[in-house]
């Protein structure tokens, strides 16, 4: 496999990370940062949250919902997938409180859960648009 055919994440895994020439623990910095390191439970919860985002289908749903509130039928049509596929992905996003819904008569409309989610989505999208 040529280097050019590797994805960005694969090529990063093959690069050697720079390390200190001589290991030296800076105790004062360690003492300052140690209380701020999240607990294993918090890290697990955050990993599950990011795992919900680590799927192209769910990110495509979020990109549509970042534009406007939509029902499952409209999301399925926009993404050219089945309603059951959209429902399945929305269930995962809801489990992490990334999307919410409201019922109007027989219709159910989905939107991003709040400004935190909208800001997270926009910040990542903006970050990916930046050039190095």
Swiss-Prot record:
Coiled coil: none annotated. InterPro entries: ArsR-like_HTH, ArsR_HTH, HTH_ArsR_DNA-bd_dom, Metal_resp_trans_reg, WH-like_DNA-bd_sf, WH_DNA-bd_sf. Keywords: DNA-binding, Metal-binding, Repressor, Transcription, Transcription regulation, Zinc. Residues 38-132 form the HTH arsR-type domain. Residues 72-91 bind DNA. The keyword Protein transport does not apply. Homodimer. This is Transcriptional repressor SmtB homolog. It comes from Synechocystis sp. (strain ATCC 27184 / PCC 6803 / Kazusa). The lineage of its organism: Bacteria, Bacillati, Cyanobacteriota, Cyanophyceae, Synechococcales.
């Amino acid at each position: 496999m040529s280097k050019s055919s590797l994805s960005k994440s694969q090529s990063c895994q093959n690069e050697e990370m720079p390390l200190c020439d001589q290991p030296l623990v800076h105790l004062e910095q360690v003492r300052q940062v140690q209380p701020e390191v999240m607990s294993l439970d918090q890290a697990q919860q955050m990993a599950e949250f990011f795992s919900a985002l680590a799927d192209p289908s769910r990110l495509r749903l979020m990109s549509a919902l970042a534009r406007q509130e939509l029902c499952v039928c409209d999301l399925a049509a926009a993404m050219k997938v089945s309603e059951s596929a959209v429902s399945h992905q929305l269930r995962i996003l809801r489990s992490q409180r990334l999307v919410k819904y409201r019922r109007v008569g027989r219709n159910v409309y989905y939107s991003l859960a709040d400004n935190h989610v909208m800001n997270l989505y926009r910040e990542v999208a903006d970050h990916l648009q930046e050039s190095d």
